[in-house]
Design a protein with these regions (language model features):
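Binuclear metal-dependent hydrolase catalytic cores centered on His/Asp/Glu-rich metal-binding motifs
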Residues: 139-177, 196-203
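Conserved beta-sheet core of the metallophosphoesterase superfamily
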Residues: 106-109, 126-127, 189-254
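Core catalytic region of metal-dependent phosphoesterases/phosphodiesterases
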Residues: 4, 9-138, 239-242
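Surface-exposed cleft-lining segments at the edges of enzyme active sites
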Residues: 79-88, 149-159, 189-195
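Histidine-centered divalent metal-coordination motifs
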Residues: 6-10, 113-114, 181, 215, ...
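Structural motif
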Residues: 3, 25-28, 145, 177-181, ...
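Beta-strand-turn-beta hairpins that frame and shape the catalytic cleft
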Residues: 1-2, 135-145, 176-177, 229-235
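Short acidic, glycine-rich surface-loop motifs adjacent to enzyme active sites
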Residues: 27, 32-34, 41, 172-189
Length: 254
């Protein structure tokens, strides 16, 4: 199987991967591109401009969440209904395009913190499988999947509370492979060395330590301090920033 994460609107790269492989594809969330921290591109830039996005990124990177919220509130000071409609239209267009690249892929897809579940499921082509949280057998492996991001303070739709993440993980029971969008709360895996943010899940870490899956695959951190890290008996591996690399992780490794 091939696992990818953080597609963020990389339509051409995703279409090329689907065309080039006959392996089972697993997509670990964040299909659309709200904001690219490298280029300032994305839906937010179309709504508010790159200078605004640059300031938002600065505030988020510095952990000034209240100021980031205030900055977003300023954008909404105009016609709120118009802004809401423009945002919805851009999201719909983004999902239509990226999900179109999964035509014929027969992929397993979960969600990340930026994803809108209802829209994602509506545009996902027939033959692909959306899984919010649950168990699968893939190529003979017992696989547990739990989508969703960790709380950021910005009330992003795809985020889960710590308690809800723990509840969904607990419902899996033991698995051989754990797939999540977020990393475990391990400093080397949760820290983005470029953005300076840290987004690890304590619930995921506790699950890994308790149930000891052989492998844990995840995304969310685009430029991690470490790609691989052994936690207890589990090899934890970042599936990579697909928008930038166009590559996934093969399991089992060749």
């Amino acid at each position: 199987m091939i696992l990818i994460a953080d597609v963020h609107g990389a339509v051409t790269k995703l279409r090329a991967l689907v065309a080039a492989t006959d392996e089972q594809l697993v997509v670990l969330g964040d299909l659309i591109n709200f904001v690219d921290y490298r280029t300032m591109d994305g839906i937010l830039a179309e709504l508010a401009g790159r200078d605004w996005v640059r300031r938002l990124i600065q505030l988020r990177t510095e952990g000034r969440i209240d100021e980031a919220r205030a900055l977003w509130s300023k954008v909404r000071e105009g016609d709120a209904n118009d802004l809401q409609q423009r945002t919805a239209d851009l999201i719909e267009a983004a999902y239509e395009e990226i999900c179109g690249a999964l035509e014929g892929a027969d992929a397993v897809v979960t969600f990340g913190n930026v994803d809108r579940l209802e829209v994602l499921q509506r545009y996902l082509p027939e033959g692909n499988t959306f899984i919010e949280a649950g168990l699968l057998e893939i190529e003979g492996w017992a696989v547990g999947v739990v989508g969703g991001g960790v709380p950021s303070g910005l009330r992003v739709p795809g985020e889960l509370s710590d308690d809800e993440m723990a509840r969904r993980l607990s419902a899996l029971g033991p698995v051989e492979i754990l797939c999540t969008h977020v990393p475990p709360a391990v400093p080397q895996l949760q820290r983005d060395v470029v953005g300076g943010t840290q987004k690890g899940s304590q619930a995921v870490l506790e699950y890994v330590l308790e149930h000891r899956p052989q492998f844990h695959y995840f995304g969310d951190i685009h430029q991690p301090q470490a790609i691989n890290w052994v936690v207890g008996d589990t090899l934890c591996k970042n599936a990579g920033y697909f928008r930038a690399t166009g590559r996934g992780v093969h399991h089992p490794a060749a």
